[in-house]
C-alpha cells in the first residue's frame, strides 16, 4: 500500500502495488475539500506503526488525521484541524511521534501539536513561533 497526496486537486490516494507487474492500482481517492473550495495538497506522512496518515491542505490551511484499516490499508477520516497559519507547506512528526510541527510558507510561523498516540488526534500547543517562509520541516 502507498499513500499519495495530489497537489493540484487536494486529494489523498490509496494505492496498492503489484510487485510482479510493477504497477499501482488506485483503491481510493479522498478529497480534502469540497468542490467549491480552492485547495492544494501539501505534505503527507504515515506513522511508523502504520496506524495513521496525516495530510496537509495548503489552500484550506488544515491538517487531516486518517486512521488506517489494518486489513486493507484504506483510510478513515478521524479529525480535521486548523493549521493556525497560512499555507502549511510541510510538517513532520517528532522522533517519538508524540508531536507534529507544521511549517507555514505565507504566515512565517511554526505550529506545534501534541499527538495522541492511541487515537491519532491532534491538540494545539503553540502557534506563534516565528519562522520565515518555511518550505520543509526536518526533526533531529
Give the label of every model feature segment.
Residues 64-113:
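C-terminal hydrophobic structural anchor segments
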Amino acid at each position: 500500500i502507498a499513500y499519495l497526496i495530489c497537489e493540484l486537486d487536494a486529494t489523498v490516494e490509496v494505492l496498492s502495488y503489484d510487485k510482479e507487474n510493477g504497477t499501482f492500482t488506485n483503491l481510493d481517492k479522498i478529497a480534502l475539500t469540497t468542490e467549491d473550495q480552492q485547495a492544494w495538497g501539501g505534505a503527507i506522512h504515515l506513522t511508523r506503526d502504520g496506524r495513521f496518515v496525516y495530510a496537509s491542505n495548503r489552500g484550506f490551511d488544515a491538517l487531516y488525521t486518517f486512521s488506517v484499516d489494518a486489513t486493507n490499508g484504506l483510510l478513515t477520516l478521524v479529525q480535521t484541524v486548523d493549521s493556525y497559519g497560512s499555507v502549511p507547506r510541510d510538517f513532520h512528526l517528532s522522533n517519538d511521534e508524540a508531536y507534529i510541527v507544521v511549517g507555514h510558507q505565507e504566515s512565517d510561523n511554526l505550529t506545534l501539536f501534541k499527538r495522541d498516540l492511541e487515537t491519532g488526534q491532534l491538540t494545539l500547543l503553540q502557534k506563534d513561533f516565528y519562522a520565515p517562509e518555511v518550505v520543509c520541516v526536518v526533526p533531529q
